[in-house]
Amino acid sequence: MLRSFLARSCAVALLGLAAAGPAAAQSNIRGDATGPTTAPGFSHPEQYMHLTPVKPAPNMYPVIQHPDLEKNAADKLAALAEKTGKKPNILIFLLDDVGWMDPGFNGGGVSVGNATPEMDKIAAEGLILTSAYSTPSCSPTRATIHTGQNPLHHGILRPPMYGEPGGLDGALTMPKLLKDAGYVTQGVGKWHMGENQGSLPQNVGYDDYVGFLGVSDMYTEWRDIYFNPEVALSPERFKMMQEDNFNHYEVHCTPADTQKCENGKLIDLDYIKDLDKHWLETSLAFLDKMKGGTKPFYLYHATRGCHFDNYPSDEWAGKSMARTVYSDCLVHMDYVFGQLMKKLEDIGEAENTLVIFTSDNGPECEIPPSGRTPFRGCKGSSWEGGVRVPTFVYWKDMIAPRKSDQLFDLADILPTALSLAGYPGAKLAELFPKKTYIDGVDQTPFLVADDGLSTRRSRIYTLNQYYAAIRIDEFKGVVTGEIEDGIVQKGNIGGFSGSIFTDTGGGVVFNLYTNPQEDVSIGIRHIPMAVPLGSAAGDYMKVLFEYPPQFKVGFLSNNPPLYDVIPEGEMAIKAWLKKHGFGRFQP
């Protein structure tokens, strides 16, 4: 894969250079000489194709520098610190399987039968990011938020299921770094980043964590006679699942016990209805404790909703105009978010809290009813529908209300949060081992500065063990993509089944503005756009050789050449096999 990819990149670059020819003006049948126009409307400072990014440190992703914006943001933050006497708080509100077009602020809401007035109100007062990116599925995204790395570097390539080993174990995380910087760290909700001891919340930086360690369907699908009658109605098989080696309970995790979390209520089809209510109460109680405190706080609130299986409580069943369990859930999540924002105001911390609202991936289209996206693909794919997620950032009186399509990756949350905690730019690299690569970038100038601009020129797409694509401005070059096949009746609907992965011919480039469905490649006609895409993609391949891909959770039957041609990557998989073997893994 590497050789063919680099060969294609070089060929495209050479074609681009050959096509450029001499710089002299030319005439053609279309009329006057070619060349850039003097009309001012064609110049867009928020587009970076022509710019060269700079690495803040050798092990950090390159950025576009904005000295004036950096100073403006620093001045605003200094004034706020003088007023509050402490560092800014960080609140992350992470939804599950919610699509880009589900909330009203992205065109959904009332128009699709699930009103989201609380989300829409706060979004309108913040910065709406229309090109914010997750990874294709939940656990890789959660690990990306916590580590500032993409899946190839943190090694959680897919969700660990039913007690599989592997997770954050050994990773340096955002809550750990913030805790070291003087923050109180609270986690609430879905974990799903490993159940082994080293991956438990209290062992990666959380002072306190209340939630569950897995994912909704692990607790529900084998209990429900509608979804899995072959298990739910069988005494032997039901007992098999009851005794399976994964945690079946809501848990409370604290550093007082680093070996395990304390089990609370059993999560069954009744209690799962109340989890988001209980988790809201937990976060509200934490915020009450922070009122008037001298320490800044970090609150990570990861909802159960709206991952399948959704079982609305009596209070929320039927509340949406769509009257589906998914839309009822989303209306409930709107209420939860609104209550958290109200509490921030009540305790007087809204002016000192950066709020990041997002989803862990696109909608799960294989399990209807599901979320909505206007883009191609869904959860489990690297098409836009799988990874472009509804996102906004809010900070009362600090972030100007606006909307931007500049690039933002959820890996950027860690560098941005640590910048606010006192470690901007290259200072962040000093906190990490030199062999750890940081894929996120500090977006403080984008979020905080007046008329802020993104510091991210390009964005890497991954798909399980694949390096799938790269985006610069509105252009996306695809190296590996999912295509329909005949394995299942309906072919690829953008998820984990019914699709195969294949390398492209090297010239697949999409203009996401004119073709958001990604089905008309312009690469051969627009080779000048393919040249910088290929160059940036090649640069990241060099990064992968110096900072090799990791393998902590992945599909062993789906190992592409990327892990073969990079010796350390192949060794990571061999080390996994030596420790755990093939088949159904156990901790």
Located regions from the model:
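Sec/Tat signal peptide C-region and signal peptidase I cleavage site
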Residues: G21-A25
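Bacterial N-terminal signal peptides
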Residues: S9-A20
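Formylglycine-dependent sulfatase
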Residues: Q26-T502, G507, L512, P516-K542, ...
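Bacterial N-terminal signal peptides that target proteins for export
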Residues: M1-A11
